[in-house]
């Protein structure tokens, strides 16, 4: 029953002009009884997800690693607390990962991301991270950092993003 939908947020990897056209046409075809339809990229979803976590998880840099087909895509969020409002910076990188589930290659990537950096937390998303192949790389990531594994971070971030649009709060300032 589409009458019960108050708002809808869709998140996707890249939100370019073409994707926006496709999503707008698709949601228009749903004939929803709401004008609260929004779209955001995975980068924005990662930002909103972090905002709604305890501050100690994003006090320093926060890293997300997304396991893809033959690569690991990473997002690194850092907040400048010396500005008002606080400014968040996001850096996106992609690392080739030609050998599936290589602990050695993952540790190499982890070191590139974390060495000489203050990292509060690391999020590992993608089904492959749930399997039991990361021994040394996971041990490295867990030293002085909180590490989380799951697959719903972008969808939760989309929900938080919509909440912030509907009722802006202190969290988003």
List where the protein language model places each region.
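Nucleotide/phosphate-binding catalytic cleft detector across ATP-hydrolyzing
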Residues: 1-62, 83-84, 143-144
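Glycine-rich beta-strand-to-loop/alpha-helix junction loops that act as flexible
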Residues: 11-13, 121-130, 158
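A short acidic (Asp/Glu
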Residues: 18-24, 49-52, 74-77, 130-137
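Short glycine-rich, Thr/Ser-proximal phosphate-binding strand/loop in the N-terminal lobe
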Residues: 74-104
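Acidic, glycine/GT-rich loop-and beta-edge segments that sit at the periphery of enzyme/chaperone cores
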Residues: 160-173
């Amino acid at each position: 029953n589409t009458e019960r939908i108050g708002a809808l947020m869709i998140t996707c990897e890249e939100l370019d002009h073409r994707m926006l056209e496709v999503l707008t046409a698709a949601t228009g075809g749903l004939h929803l009884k709401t004008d609260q339809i929004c779209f955001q990229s995975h980068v924005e979803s990662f930002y909103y997800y972090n905002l709604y976590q305890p501050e100690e998880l994003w006090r320093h840099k926060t890293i997300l690693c997304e396991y893809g087909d033959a690569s690991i895509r990473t997002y690194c969020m850092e907040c400048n607390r010396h500005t008002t409002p606080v400014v968040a910076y996001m850096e996106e990188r992609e690392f080739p990962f030609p050998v599936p589930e290589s602990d050695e290659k993952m540790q190499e990537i982890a070191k590139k991301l974390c060495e000489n950096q203050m990292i509060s937390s690391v999020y590992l998303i993608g089904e492959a991270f749930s399997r039991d192949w990361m021994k040394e790389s996971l041990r490295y990531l867990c030293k002085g950092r909180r590490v989380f594994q799951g697959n719903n971070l972008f969808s939760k971030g989309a929900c938080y993003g919509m909440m912030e649009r509907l009722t802006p709060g202190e969290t988003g300032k």
